[in-house]
Amino acid sequence: MRLGISTALKHTTPKEWAEKMELLGCKAVVFPVDCTASDLLVADYMNEAKKHDLLIAEVGIWKNVFAVNPKEREEAREYARRQLRLADEIGAVCCVNVAGTFGGPIWDGGYPENFSTEAWSELVSYTKKLIDEVRPHRVKYSIEPMPWMYPTGPDEYLRLEKDINREEFGIHFDFVNMIN
């Protein structure tokens, strides 16, 4: 088992990042740059990860792909596509996002609409579309469980996996989020 933390810590170079992770005893890490980084910078981080035996556990999206504002929603979806492509290119274990919110302005907020039948259907439909469009080969796309949006626990996660029915969809089992 590899242990890690969910932050890249403050650093100025890929080498400093990798050394800090190693010093903490981390062997699983979140990727510290996103799809807007240059190919050279991404390669530098990957080289340092390899030198220090760091597994890229996840590439985060952390955007509301169901935002009420159409412009914000499309920007979030484009970012999700680009992040999933990046995660696949670097061989991350997963590319993760929360389901998103359906009832208000806070991207990860708790709203009653988050538990509607429509929210479930939209989540399943969107996830299928994202996977089918990007067609990742090396990474699993996953949804972070949260107590105030789907999935909230193992039963919903299993149902979500069944309904999405894509080999490229994986389970991001964050049990702390299920109980907090």
Where do the protein language model's features map onto the residues?
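Hydrophobic faces of well-ordered beta-strands that scaffold small-molecule active sites
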Residues: 2-7, 29-31, 56-61, 95-97, ...
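Acidic-and-aromatic substrate-binding clefts and catalytic sites of carbohydrate-active enzymes
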Residues: 7-15, 31-43, 65-71, 103, ...
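Active-site acidic/histidine proton-transfer and metal-coordination neighborhood
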Residues: 15, 19, 51, 70-171
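A short, Lys/Arg-enriched amphipathic alpha-helix followed by its capping loop at the start of a domain
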Residues: 3, 20-27
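Short, composition-biased local secondary-structure segments
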Residues: 8-23, 54
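N-terminal small/glycine-rich loop or linker at the start of catalytic domains
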Residues: 1-4, 57-66, 101-110
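Aromatic-lined substrate-binding rim segments of carbohydrate-active enzymes
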Residues: 39-53, 58
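Accessory recognition modules or surfaces
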Residues: 27-28, 45
